[in-house]
Design a protein with these regions (language model features):
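Short, glycine-/Ser/Thr-/acidic-enriched flexible segments
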Residues: 126, 300, 336-339
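Conserved non-cysteine loop/helix-boundary elements of the Radical SAM core domain that shape
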Residues: 81-280
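Radical SAM enzyme core and accessory elements
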Residues: 1-8, 12-16, 20, 49-53, ...
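Key residue(s) within conserved catalytic/signature motifs
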Residues: 1, 43, 47, 76-77, ...
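A C-terminal junction/extension of Radical SAM enzymes
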Residues: 255, 259, 263-333
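Canonical Radical SAM [4Fe-4S] cluster-binding loop centered on the CxxxCxxC motif
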Residues: 59-95
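Beta-strand scaffold of nucleotide-dependent catalytic cores
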Residues: 66, 180, 248-252, 321, ...
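N-terminal [4Fe-4S]-dependent radical SAM core
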Residues: 15-63
Length: 389
């Protein structure tokens, strides 16, 4: 089976009135899925149903805010991001534009009669902003939206080399209910190999600071298949993450992305033969009380394997589910942002794209604001052609 959203197929078949037996045959017979993988996908679909129902209420939406800056570029990354040291002068003008775009999104959402459901500030690395810049951005969010009615507010605090106690306190003070601290691995050697300028101990210290700041819903990302890692090394990272007891642990499989340094250095998929054995260690998560709640795949992922979000009961990441299952409008702010407008139960969709690079986003910001008027227009008129950038 190929495709990004295998769980979506289960939801679609159920919505079409298929029996559970016919769905089983579809996956196990037609696509020859492994029973273990299919049972996981089906359990995820069962868990998601009430969450999707809540997120599918007409005219609800989630807000994504992108911060395309990082302290360094990881070897596996192909996202649009700027080196913080090289492009620091661009950061403040970018934040100023971003705040103005958030205000415009609020105006257009109100005009369209939309209700905010969740917020996600991602990147890049959002904590590459200074504490004052985080206050400016998150203050703008708080001034424009009633956070008491938001189901979830996530900020990626991914890297300990730019996440300190002050920033963690700001994130908490300004209303975030969920953060993500992303070690990827707890091996110092592997961290150095992928271009991370911090140690495993720095991750532990950052996690402790987050708990001291009062953060009660923390996700941690790990990647199976990183260069130089082993099955034993990945198991160590998994056990270390479990020992910290975060509410979420997301296990990604390495994807060989065309613009990443890994691919440019001509490393091949057969250099990562142990990745399936690494993912088999995820039984440790189930044994520790975590359960899978969302699943997706990407093109060029090692051995066509999957990315799975695991959580403790009651700590499912709503935004992750909504964006992956395409049941809800996502309004996006920032460079590279892709707004996805959804109506009529997913039968009508339209995208509005922001400019890809931060400098172009800043220089052509008036056009960014003009395009956002398409949000209200979408809900006033029939679906038209996609707006591209």
């Amino acid at each position: 089976m190929t495709g990004v959203r295998p769980v979506r197929l289960i939801h679609d078949k159920r919505a079409a009135g298929w029996s559970e037996e016919d769905i089983d045959q579809f996956f196990l017979g037609r696509f020859d899925c492994s029973r273990q993988k299919y049972q996981m996908a089906k359990a995820i679909a069962d868990l998601q149903e009430p969450i999707l129902k809540a997120g599918s209420v007409p005219k609800t939406y989630s807000l994504y805010i992108g911060i395309p800056f990082c302290p360094s570029r990881c070897s596996y990354c192909s996202f649009v991001s700027c080196n913080l040291d090289r492009d620091r002068k661009m950061v403040q003008p970018y934040v100023d534009c971003l705040c103005r775009e958030v205000e415009e999104i609020k105006a257009q959402a109100d005009k369209a009669g939309l209700t905010l459901c969740s917020i996600y500030i991602g990147g890049g690395t959002p904590t590459s902003l200074s504490a004052d810049q985080l206050r400016q951005l998150m203050g703008t969010v708080r001034e424009n939206f009633d956070l008491s009615k938001v189901m979830e507010y996530t900020v990626e605090a991914g890297r300990p080399d730019c996440t300190d106690a002050e920033k963690l306190a700001v994130i908490k003070e300004y209303g975030a209910t969920r953060i993500s601290i992303n070690p990827q691995t707890f091996s110092d050697e592997v961290l150095a190999g992928i271009g991370r300028k911090h140690s495993a101990q720095d991750i532990l210290d950052c996690y402790a600071d987050a708990r001291k700041a009062g953060h009660e819903d923390i996700n941690m990302d790990l990647i199976a298949g990183l260069p130089g890692d082993t099955v034993e090394g990945f198991e160590h990272s998994l056990r270390q993450a479990i020992a910290l007891d975060p509410e979420n642990i997301t296990v990604h499989t390495l994807t060989l992305k065309r613009a990443s340094r890994i691919v440019m250095e001509d490393q091949k998929e057969n250099d990562y033969a142990d990745v399936a054995a690494m993912l088999e260690k995820c039984h440790l998560l189930a044994e520790a009380g975590y359960r899978p709640y969302y699943l997706y795949r990407q093109k060029n992922t090692l051995q066509n394997l999957e990315n799975v979000g695991w959580c403790k009961p009651g700590h499912e990441g709503y935004y992750n589910i909504y964006i992956m299952e395409e049941v809800q409008t996502i309004l996006s702010a920032g460079a590279g942002g892709s707004t996805k407008l959804v109506a009529d139960g997913g039968k009508r969709m339209q995208r509005i794209f922001n400019f890809k690079y931060p400098n172009e986003y800043i220089q052509r910001f008036a056009e960014v604001l003009e395009r956002k008027k398409g949000v209200a227009d979408f809900y006033d008129h029939d679906l038209g052609p996609e707006t591209v950038g």
